[in-house]
Amino acid sequence: TSAVNGEGKSVTAVNLALTCARQEHLKVVLVDADMRKSSVPQWLGLKDRHTGLSTVLARDGEMDGSLVSLESPPLTVLPAGPVAEHPAELLESTAMKRLLATLKTQFDLIIIDAPPALAVADPGILAAQADGVLLVVRAGKTQRKTVLQAQELLKKMKANLLGCVLTHVEYYMPGYNKYYQYYRREADVKTANGHGNATVGAAA
């Protein structure tokens, strides 16, 4: 997750999922849990779908026809689905717990893209169900007090905060005459045409 909008959480979650999916024998699923303002399909070039997390939870956790499989790298995606009226209630439901339990039997790693922590209750609900949480922070934009507020909120929700991911950082490599950026907005993501138990709530 991130503290507020525009930090780069979704592209971070997508890049993390793609990178992990390239590891041999590691089955990865990316769950788009930002049912209010999803951007995962944009980064992965997925078409709008009428099914996804919102419809799965409305069907009591039944995933038939909702998972999307990418070939290269071999990544499975559960899109957010149609905009839900009460996302927090769905994420806190028994159906969500059942869904995560099912995914853990099929995948080695579950990466969840959650909404901003200070915007809605959803991230706190997801954090309590995840094995670990990454907080995405945008360099040069996010204020220190905002990050601390997000950290404190996650701690109150008993989240296992693994650390922070700093985005939009420029650095200079000795011997080269140009700057490179982490998580460029036009990154390789756009070129991207489980038995396990790890669940990571990542963050855009």
Name the predicted role of every residue range.
Residues 1-204:
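P-loop NTP-binding module
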